[in-house]
Swiss-Prot record:
PANTHER family: ANTIPORTER SUBUNIT MNHC2-RELATED (PTHR34583:SF2). Belongs to the CPA3 antiporters (TC 2.A.63) subunit C family. This is Na(+)/H(+) antiporter subunit C1. May form a heterooligomeric complex that consists of seven subunits: mnhA1, mnhB1, mnhC1, mnhD1, mnhE1, mnhF1 and mnhG1. The gene is mnhC1. It comes from Staphylococcus haemolyticus (strain JCSC1435).
Length: 113
């Protein structure tokens, strides 16, 4: 199962790199969001996709699940949500000010005034 998840992470990362290299601001924001999801999926896969009990319930459990990757992923999801919201607001404000979301057209917009 871990091998399949690693391939899925690679596909998500390659799609996100394609989106980040595009000229539209919305696609760039979607690409950065997708790369965070790919890295979260990679971290949770490297933590192990196994079944077990949490170590705080009972003392005589044969298989434990490591809670550290889950805690890290939860923190990363919150940070990714905040940065995505900031990027969306920044892209919207840039579109309202400059009238375009194309990165190539933004280069000379302020120089013409």
């Amino acid at each position: 199962m871990e091998i399949i998840m690693i391939f899925v992470c690679g596909i998500l990362a390659s799609i996100s790199v394609y989106l980040v290299l595009s000229k539209s601001l919305i696609r760039i924001v979607m690409g950065t969001t997708l790369i965070t999801h790919a890295s979260n999926l990679f971290l949770i896969t490297m933590g192990g996709l196994k079944h077990g009990e949490m170590p705080i319930y009972e003392k005589n459990i044969s298989q434990y699940v490591d809670p550290i990757p889950h805690a890290l992923i939860l923190t990363a999801i919150v940070i990714a949500f905040a940065t995505t919201a900031f990027f969306l607001v920044l892209a919207f404000r840039t579109y309202k000010e400059l009238g375009t979301d194309n990165v190539e057209r933004m280069k000379g917009v302020l120089d013409d005034d």
